[in-house]
A protein has these predicted regions:
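Acidic helix N-cap motif at the loop->helix transition within catalytic regions
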Residues: 11-20, 59, 63
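Conserved donor NDP-sugar-binding/catalytic core segment of glycosyltransferases
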Residues: 63-95
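Short loop->beta transition adjacent to catalytic acidic/histidine clusters or analogous donor-positioning motifs
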Residues: 1-4, 13, 23-26
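Glycine-rich, basic loop-to-helix element that forms the pyrophosphate-binding segment
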Residues: 30-46
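Conserved nucleotide-sugar donor-binding catalytic segment
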Residues: 103-186
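The conserved acidic donor/metal-binding loop of glycosyltransferases
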Residues: 55-59, 83
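A conserved acidic beta->alpha catalytic loop
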Residues: 7-16, 33, 55
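Short aromatic/hydrophobic "clamp" motif used to bind/position activated sugar donors
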Residues: 51
Length: 258
Protein backbone atom coordinates (compact mmCIF):
# COMPACT_ATOMS: atom_id res chain seq x y z
CA UNK A 1 0.00 0.00 0.00
CA UNK A 2 1.31 3.43 -0.97
CA UNK A 3 0.45 6.12 1.59
CA UNK A 4 0.70 9.72 0.37
CA UNK A 5 0.22 12.48 2.94
CA UNK A 6 -0.33 16.05 1.78
CA UNK A 7 0.58 18.74 4.28
CA UNK A 8 -1.48 21.63 2.91
CA UNK A 9 0.13 24.51 4.78
CA UNK A 10 -0.54 23.21 8.30
CA UNK A 11 0.36 25.54 11.18
CA UNK A 12 0.52 22.92 13.94
CA UNK A 13 2.95 20.00 14.36
CA UNK A 14 1.33 17.84 11.64
CA UNK A 15 4.41 17.92 9.40
CA UNK A 16 6.65 16.93 12.30
CA UNK A 17 4.41 13.93 13.04
CA UNK A 18 4.41 12.90 9.38
CA UNK A 19 8.20 13.10 9.17
CA UNK A 20 8.49 10.61 12.02
CA UNK A 21 6.97 8.06 9.60
CA UNK A 22 8.98 9.19 6.56
CA UNK A 23 10.42 5.70 5.98
CA UNK A 24 6.89 4.33 5.45
CA UNK A 25 4.99 7.13 3.72
CA UNK A 26 5.39 9.74 0.99
CA UNK A 27 5.15 13.29 2.34
CA UNK A 28 4.35 16.29 0.17
CA UNK A 29 4.32 19.73 1.79
CA UNK A 30 2.77 22.69 0.00
CA UNK A 31 1.36 26.10 0.86
CA UNK A 32 -2.33 26.11 1.74
CA UNK A 33 -4.29 25.81 -1.51
CA UNK A 34 -7.39 24.01 -0.27
CA UNK A 35 -8.76 20.47 -0.33
CA UNK A 36 -9.17 20.04 -4.09
CA UNK A 37 -5.59 21.16 -4.73
CA UNK A 38 -4.29 18.69 -2.13
CA UNK A 39 -6.29 15.93 -3.81
CA UNK A 40 -4.91 16.76 -7.25
CA UNK A 41 -1.37 16.79 -5.83
CA UNK A 42 -1.84 13.35 -4.28
CA UNK A 43 -3.48 11.87 -7.39
CA UNK A 44 -0.61 13.07 -9.62
CA UNK A 45 1.88 11.45 -7.24
CA UNK A 46 0.15 8.06 -6.91
CA UNK A 47 1.45 5.02 -8.79
CA UNK A 48 -1.11 2.37 -7.84
CA UNK A 49 -4.29 1.05 -9.48
CA UNK A 50 -6.61 2.31 -6.74
CA UNK A 51 -7.20 5.65 -5.06
CA UNK A 52 -8.50 6.01 -1.51
CA UNK A 53 -9.16 9.45 -0.09
CA UNK A 54 -8.91 9.49 3.69
CA UNK A 55 -9.21 12.38 6.14
CA UNK A 56 -6.51 12.69 8.83
CA UNK A 57 -8.72 12.24 11.89
CA UNK A 58 -10.91 9.35 10.69
CA UNK A 59 -10.30 5.66 11.43
CA UNK A 60 -10.08 2.54 9.24
CA UNK A 61 -10.31 -1.09 10.29
CA UNK A 62 -7.50 -3.54 9.51
CA UNK A 63 -9.74 -5.17 6.88
CA UNK A 64 -11.04 -1.98 5.24
CA UNK A 65 -8.68 -1.78 2.26
CA UNK A 66 -8.84 -5.50 1.43
CA UNK A 67 -12.64 -5.51 1.59
CA UNK A 68 -12.88 -2.49 -0.71
CA UNK A 69 -10.36 -3.83 -3.24
CA UNK A 70 -11.93 -7.31 -3.33
CA UNK A 71 -15.36 -5.82 -4.02
CA UNK A 72 -14.09 -3.23 -6.52
CA UNK A 73 -12.47 -5.98 -8.62
CA UNK A 74 -15.94 -7.49 -9.14
CA UNK A 75 -17.39 -4.29 -10.62
CA UNK A 76 -15.74 -2.55 -13.57
CA UNK A 77 -16.23 1.19 -14.18
CA UNK A 78 -17.65 1.45 -10.65
CA UNK A 79 -16.90 3.43 -7.49
CA UNK A 80 -17.44 1.25 -4.42
CA UNK A 81 -18.39 2.71 -1.04
CA UNK A 82 -19.53 1.37 2.32
CA UNK A 83 -21.54 1.97 5.45
CA UNK A 84 -19.77 3.78 8.28
CA UNK A 85 -19.89 4.80 11.91
CA UNK A 86 -19.92 8.30 13.38
CA UNK A 87 -17.55 9.08 16.25
CA UNK A 88 -17.03 12.29 18.23
CA UNK A 89 -13.83 14.26 18.86
CA UNK A 90 -12.80 11.76 21.57
CA UNK A 91 -13.48 8.66 19.46
CA UNK A 92 -16.75 7.72 21.15
CA UNK A 93 -19.22 6.01 18.82
CA UNK A 94 -22.31 8.15 18.30
CA UNK A 95 -24.20 5.96 15.85
CA UNK A 96 -23.90 3.62 12.89
CA UNK A 97 -24.78 5.13 9.52
CA UNK A 98 -26.35 2.81 6.96
CA UNK A 99 -26.47 4.14 3.42
CA UNK A 100 -29.60 3.50 1.37
CA UNK A 101 -28.89 0.36 -0.65
CA UNK A 102 -29.53 1.17 -4.32
CA UNK A 103 -27.46 -1.69 -5.77
CA UNK A 104 -30.49 -3.16 -7.55
CA UNK A 105 -31.33 0.10 -9.33
CA UNK A 106 -30.31 0.92 -12.88
CA UNK A 107 -27.69 3.64 -13.34
CA UNK A 108 -30.41 6.06 -14.44
CA UNK A 109 -32.50 5.37 -11.32
CA UNK A 110 -29.44 5.75 -9.10
CA UNK A 111 -28.56 9.03 -10.79
CA UNK A 112 -32.02 10.36 -9.94
CA UNK A 113 -31.19 9.77 -6.25
CA UNK A 114 -27.90 11.63 -6.71
CA UNK A 115 -29.70 14.55 -8.34
CA UNK A 116 -32.07 14.58 -5.37
CA UNK A 117 -29.10 15.14 -3.05
CA UNK A 118 -28.07 11.58 -2.18
CA UNK A 119 -24.70 11.92 -0.42
CA UNK A 120 -21.83 9.45 -0.40
CA UNK A 121 -19.18 9.64 2.31
CA UNK A 122 -16.05 9.95 0.18
CA UNK A 123 -13.93 8.53 3.01
CA UNK A 124 -15.65 5.16 2.50
CA UNK A 125 -14.93 5.01 -1.24
CA UNK A 126 -12.36 3.23 -3.37
CA UNK A 127 -11.83 4.57 -6.89
CA UNK A 128 -9.87 2.92 -9.70
CA UNK A 129 -7.11 5.23 -10.94
CA UNK A 130 -8.44 4.74 -14.49
CA UNK A 131 -11.72 6.40 -13.45
CA UNK A 132 -9.83 9.48 -12.26
CA UNK A 133 -8.67 9.94 -15.85
CA UNK A 134 -12.34 10.31 -16.83
CA UNK A 135 -13.48 12.63 -14.05
CA UNK A 136 -11.59 14.89 -11.62
CA UNK A 137 -12.27 16.86 -8.44
CA UNK A 138 -13.27 20.48 -9.04
CA UNK A 139 -12.00 23.43 -6.97
CA UNK A 140 -14.77 24.46 -4.54
CA UNK A 141 -14.72 26.12 -1.11
CA UNK A 142 -16.98 23.56 0.57
CA UNK A 143 -15.56 20.04 1.19
CA UNK A 144 -18.99 18.34 1.01
CA UNK A 145 -19.66 20.14 -2.28
CA UNK A 146 -16.35 18.87 -3.70
CA UNK A 147 -17.45 15.28 -2.98
CA UNK A 148 -20.95 15.76 -4.37
CA UNK A 149 -19.72 17.54 -7.50
CA UNK A 150 -17.29 14.71 -8.23
CA UNK A 151 -19.85 11.94 -7.71
CA UNK A 152 -22.63 13.63 -9.68
CA UNK A 153 -20.27 14.46 -12.54
CA UNK A 154 -18.86 10.92 -12.49
CA UNK A 155 -22.35 9.44 -12.77
CA UNK A 156 -24.08 11.75 -15.25
CA UNK A 157 -21.18 13.04 -17.35
CA UNK A 158 -18.69 10.15 -17.24
CA UNK A 159 -21.01 7.13 -17.08
CA UNK A 160 -19.51 5.73 -13.87
CA UNK A 161 -21.59 3.40 -11.66
CA UNK A 162 -21.72 3.02 -7.86
CA UNK A 163 -21.90 -0.04 -5.61
CA UNK A 164 -22.54 -0.15 -1.86
CA UNK A 165 -20.78 -2.56 0.50
CA UNK A 166 -23.20 -3.12 3.37
CA UNK A 167 -20.42 -3.62 5.94
CA UNK A 168 -19.27 -0.63 8.02
CA UNK A 169 -15.64 0.06 7.04
CA UNK A 170 -14.91 3.55 8.36
CA UNK A 171 -15.19 5.48 11.61
CA UNK A 172 -15.98 9.05 10.56
CA UNK A 173 -15.08 11.70 13.12
CA UNK A 174 -17.50 14.61 13.31
CA UNK A 175 -16.75 17.97 14.93
CA UNK A 176 -19.30 20.33 16.44
CA UNK A 177 -18.44 23.17 14.03
CA UNK A 178 -19.43 20.95 11.09
CA UNK A 179 -23.03 21.04 12.28
CA UNK A 180 -23.46 24.81 12.29
CA UNK A 181 -26.48 26.25 10.48
CA UNK A 182 -24.18 28.46 8.41
CA UNK A 183 -22.13 25.52 7.11
CA UNK A 184 -25.20 23.42 6.29
CA UNK A 185 -26.88 26.33 4.48
CA UNK A 186 -23.72 26.99 2.45
CA UNK A 187 -23.48 23.33 1.44
CA UNK A 188 -27.12 23.26 0.28
CA UNK A 189 -26.50 26.32 -1.89
CA UNK A 190 -23.50 24.61 -3.46
CA UNK A 191 -25.48 21.42 -4.13
CA UNK A 192 -28.17 23.37 -5.99
CA UNK A 193 -25.50 25.07 -8.12
CA UNK A 194 -23.80 21.75 -8.85
CA UNK A 195 -27.03 20.07 -9.98
CA UNK A 196 -27.77 22.93 -12.38
CA UNK A 197 -24.21 22.93 -13.74
CA UNK A 198 -24.16 19.18 -14.42
CA UNK A 199 -27.63 19.13 -15.98
CA UNK A 200 -26.70 21.95 -18.35
CA UNK A 201 -23.83 19.85 -19.70
CA UNK A 202 -26.18 17.06 -20.81
CA UNK A 203 -27.85 16.81 -24.20
CA UNK A 204 -31.25 18.50 -24.08
CA UNK A 205 -33.34 15.31 -24.45
CA UNK A 206 -31.36 13.53 -21.70
CA UNK A 207 -31.55 16.59 -19.43
CA UNK A 208 -35.32 16.86 -19.94
CA UNK A 209 -35.78 13.18 -19.07
CA UNK A 210 -33.75 13.54 -15.88
CA UNK A 211 -35.69 16.66 -14.83
CA UNK A 212 -39.03 14.95 -15.50
CA UNK A 213 -38.11 11.77 -13.59
CA UNK A 214 -36.59 13.79 -10.73
CA UNK A 215 -39.85 15.71 -10.28
CA UNK A 216 -41.81 12.43 -10.28
CA UNK A 217 -39.45 10.91 -7.73
CA UNK A 218 -39.67 13.96 -5.45
CA UNK A 219 -43.46 13.93 -5.71
CA UNK A 220 -43.52 10.26 -4.66
CA UNK A 221 -41.16 11.01 -1.76
CA UNK A 222 -43.41 13.85 -0.62
CA UNK A 223 -46.48 11.58 -0.62
CA UNK A 224 -44.65 8.87 1.34
CA UNK A 225 -43.44 11.44 3.88
CA UNK A 226 -46.94 12.80 4.43
CA UNK A 227 -48.31 9.26 4.85
CA UNK A 228 -45.60 8.46 7.39
CA UNK A 229 -46.23 11.67 9.33
CA UNK A 230 -49.96 10.90 9.45
CA UNK A 231 -49.24 7.34 10.60
CA UNK A 232 -46.93 8.51 13.38
CA UNK A 233 -49.49 11.07 14.52
CA UNK A 234 -52.17 8.36 14.55
CA UNK A 235 -49.92 6.03 16.55
CA UNK A 236 -49.29 8.77 19.12
CA UNK A 237 -53.05 8.94 19.80
CA UNK A 238 -53.46 5.21 20.45
CA UNK A 239 -52.67 3.35 23.69
CA UNK A 240 -49.07 2.10 23.77
CA UNK A 241 -50.10 -1.57 23.83
CA UNK A 242 -51.97 -1.03 20.56
CA UNK A 243 -49.31 1.11 18.85
CA UNK A 244 -46.57 -1.36 19.83
CA UNK A 245 -48.46 -4.22 18.19
CA UNK A 246 -49.02 -2.17 15.03
CA UNK A 247 -45.32 -1.29 14.81
CA UNK A 248 -44.26 -4.91 15.31
CA UNK A 249 -46.71 -6.02 12.60
CA UNK A 250 -45.34 -3.57 10.04
CA UNK A 251 -41.71 -4.21 10.94
CA UNK A 252 -42.28 -7.91 10.30
CA UNK A 253 -43.93 -7.06 6.97
CA UNK A 254 -40.91 -4.94 5.99
CA UNK A 255 -38.51 -7.78 6.85
CA UNK A 256 -40.56 -10.26 4.79
CA UNK A 257 -40.51 -7.96 1.75
CA UNK A 258 -36.76 -7.35 1.74
Amino acid sequence: IEIICIDDGSTDNSLEILESYSDKITIISQENKGLASALHTGIKQMKGDWFKWFSPDDVMYSYTIKTLVDEAKKHSNTIVYSNWEIIDEKGNKLRAFHESNYNELSDFEYNIRLLDGQQINVNTTLIASSLLEKCSFRELDDPVAIDYDFFLSSALLCGISFHLISKSLIKYRIHSEQLSHENISKTLDYISEIVNRVLQKLDAHIRDRYIHELKQYQKTKSTKRKTMEFGLKLLSLTPSWVSDRILIFYLNKIRQNR
